[in-house]
Amino acid sequence: MGRLDGKVIVLTAAAQGIGRASALAFAREGAKVIATDINESKLQELESYRGIQTRVLDVTKKRQIDQFASEIERIDVLFNVAGFVHHGTILDCEEKDWDFSMNLNVRSMFLMIKAFLPKMLAQKSGNIINMSSVASSIKGVENRCVYSATKAAVIGLTKSVAADFIQQGIRCNCVCPGTVDTPSLQERIQARDNPKEALKTFLNRQKTGRFASAEEVALLCVYLASDESAYVTGNPVIIDGGWSL
């Protein structure tokens, strides 16, 4: 018996990183996983795993989301993972940077929840998990102005949905990681003028002396997706190795 037997889980940004690790972890625990991403080639790699089906989806496009939602008969868990990390202070951020991050990091979750929540309400049960960060309203982080603003908004969105629909059988939580070793992190490190120094800076702020793995975060997501967390809602759940202490 798996911890997620029989559950239908839809997640975004499943082609790599935390999304991919979570899709695999959900499937191992018996869930029927519908994994979405804009990256078709990487997404197709998941097709070989039992319990996972894939669908190309741009979460910034409302029409695509609404069409996708119309094709799904039942959903138990919605996991909104898609996001982008902008590097810099407010002075390094142009309006287009702000708009892009807000669109991908916040508006996409708004659109996904709006599309799938009615199905959950009709079922009188549903579970929404949003990807936030400790770089948000939890902790001020240098050179993460836009990113932190978007992730603070995700916490607010999460709490609002949880409060509004708690009596209709809906739960909503968000995951707040610290620094996670993902392809996205490695790309950001390599994009810096001095990648070796950038890696050192990232590691120096880790009180555990290491990054989290995507698989560690995925295990927390399994718990939040399962009935084991049935009494947990409206929470920003921190997994950061003590970084925010």
Curated annotation (Swiss-Prot):
Catalytic activity: cis-4-hydroxy-L-proline + NAD(+) = 4-oxo-L-proline + NADH + H(+); (R)-3-hydroxybutanoate + NAD(+) = acetoacetate + NADH + H(+)
SUPFAM superfamilies: NAD(P)-binding Rossmann-fold domains
Tissue-specificity statement: Detected in liver, spleen and macrophages. Widely expressed.
Localization: Cytoplasm
Record-linked PROSITE patterns: ADH_SHORT
Entry keywords, A to Z: Cytoplasm, Lipid metabolism, NAD, Oxidoreductase
Stated induction or repression of this protein's expression: Down-regulated upon E.coli infection to limit access to host iron pool. Down-regulated in macrophages by exposure to bacterial lipopolysaccharide (LPS).
Active-site residue list: 147
EC assignment: 1.1.1.-, 1.1.1.30, 1.1.1.104
Described function: NAD(H)-dependent dehydrogenase/reductase with a preference for cyclic substrates. Catalyzes stereoselective conversion of 4-oxo-L-proline to cis-4-hydroxy-L-proline, likely a detoxification mechanism for ketoprolines. Mediates the formation of 2,5-dihydroxybenzoate (2,5-DHBA), a siderophore that chelates free cytoplasmic iron and associates with LCN2, thereby regulating iron transport and homeostasis while protecting cells against free radical-induced oxidative stress. (Microbial infection) May play a role in susceptibility to bacterial infection by providing an assimilable source of iron that is exploited by pathogenic bacteria. Host iron-siderophore complexes can be used by bacteria to promote their own growth and pathogenicity.
Protein name per UniProt: Dehydrogenase/reductase SDR family member 6
Native organism: Mus musculus
High-level lineage: Eukaryota, Metazoa, Chordata, Craniata, Vertebrata
Gene name, Swiss-Prot/TrEMBL: Bdh2
